[in-house]
Amino acid sequence: MSTPPLAASGMAPGPFAGPQAQQAAREVNTASLCRIGQETVQDIVYRTMEIFQLLRNMQLPNGVTYHTGTYQDRLAKLQDHLRQLSILFRKLRLVYDKCNENCGGMDPIPVEQLIPYVEEDGSKDDRAGPPRFASEERREIAEVNKFQVNSKGTQPYLHMYPFSSKLPSHSGCRIPLSRIPCAVQNSNRRINS
């Protein structure tokens, strides 16, 4: 089996020869580095499981005659796994350092800012957001309750509190009136008066 001739022997250099190849090798995608790191972690877990399997199968020297060949074989496997494990940890550290180096210039963005809002009116006051949403939701529930009337036509059907619709009036209801939306209370007062 012969080796391929080098570029110095008269053949044109390949497309990845020279400074472009070195620059391409240096600029590795961070996502591919993370994938390599994930595979390295999986290899570490696999090697560690094999080490524990070897240790579990070893017998303690309790005065039992131990075959020298078996002992040497298991010891060699254990040392090989430990050596490979230390190499994998070094590789993982290099990948970790390279990922941190690539992401070093990026400012961490809070997770709350990554959530897209459907309706943004341009206001930057974060404290005004949740009460506005709650008041809109309350208004929608009040409109739905205002237009829903049960089969008798005398009381609004409270779909939020299904057990209260079986009662003849709100006087016997166990729900405090403060828990019922204002529009339902007002419509109930109009019906009862």
Swiss-Prot record:
Gene of this entry: MED30
Keyword line: Acetylation, Activator, Coiled coil, Nucleus, Transcription, Transcription regulation
Function, in words: Component of the Mediator complex, a coactivator involved in the regulated transcription of nearly all RNA polymerase II-dependent genes. Mediator functions as a bridge to convey information from gene-specific regulatory proteins to the basal RNA polymerase II transcription machinery. Mediator is recruited to promoters by direct interactions with regulatory proteins and serves as a scaffold for the assembly of a functional preinitiation complex with RNA polymerase II and the general transcription factors.
Keyword check for Ribosomal protein: no
Gene Ontology CC annotation, any one: mediator complex
Name the record gives this protein: Mediator of RNA polymerase II transcription subunit 30
BP GO terms, sorted: positive regulation of DNA-templated transcription
Superkingdom of source: Eukaryota
Low complexity bias: start-end ranges: 10-20
Localization in the cell: Nucleus
Subunit structure, as described in the record: Component of the Mediator complex, which is composed of MED1, MED4, MED6, MED7, MED8, MED9, MED10, MED11, MED12, MED13, MED13L, MED14, MED15, MED16, MED17, MED18, MED19, MED20, MED21, MED22, MED23, MED24, MED25, MED26, MED27, MED29, MED30, MED31, CCNC, CDK8 and CDC2L6/CDK11. The MED12, MED13, CCNC and CDK8 subunits form a distinct module termed the CDK8 module. Mediator containing the CDK8 module is less active than Mediator lacking this module in supporting transcriptional activation.
Gene source species: Bos taurus (Bovine)
Region Disordered: start-end pairs: 1-20
Family according to the record: Belongs to the Mediator complex subunit 30 family.
GO molecular function (one): transcription coregulator activity
Post-translational modification N-acetylserine, affected residues: 2
Coiled-coil residue spans: 71-93
InterPro entries: Mediator_Med30_met
